[in-house]
């Protein structure tokens, strides 16, 4: 994902590009149904990547507050993620020159989440 990062872009753009890249691979493997864009729009990636793409590095390893996420009420963060179909945690910030951040895309095949989605007929 580092190749697409440009100064002043929103981190959500990078996060969404990671979702799309991973979804395209999963569709190609037959693990997600339909076009990748439809799967992402439907929230399928929250089942397999229920976290942000990465985080900034600073005085604290997970310097979330400096990146626009002022609330550490994880319940409300999870609720917003479910409503938007994306993980919004640690994504509400603009990338500025000199920003240091991690790039941690990853898929987690969590049986409880997969079973829940299957039971609901999703993805």
Question: What are these model-derived regions, one by one?
Answer:
Residues 1-123:
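Active-site neighborhoods and metal-handling regions in enzymes and metal-associated proteins
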């Amino acid at each position: 994902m580092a190749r697409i990062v440009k100064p002043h872009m929103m981190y959500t753009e990078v996060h969404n590009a990671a979702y799309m890249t991973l979804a395209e691979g999963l569709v190609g493997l037959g693990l997600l149904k339909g076009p990748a864009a439809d799967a992402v729009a439907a929230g399928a990636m929250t089942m397999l990547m229920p976290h942000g793409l990465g985080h900034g590095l600073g005085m604290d390893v997970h310097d979330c507050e400096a990146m626009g996420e002022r609330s550490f009420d994880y319940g409300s963060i999870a609720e917003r993620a479910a409503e938007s179909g994306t993980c919004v945690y640690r994504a509400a910030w603009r990338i500025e020159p000199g920003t240091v951040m991690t790039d941690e895309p990853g898929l987690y095949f969590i049986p409880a989440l997969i079973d829940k989605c299957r039971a609901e007929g999703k993805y």
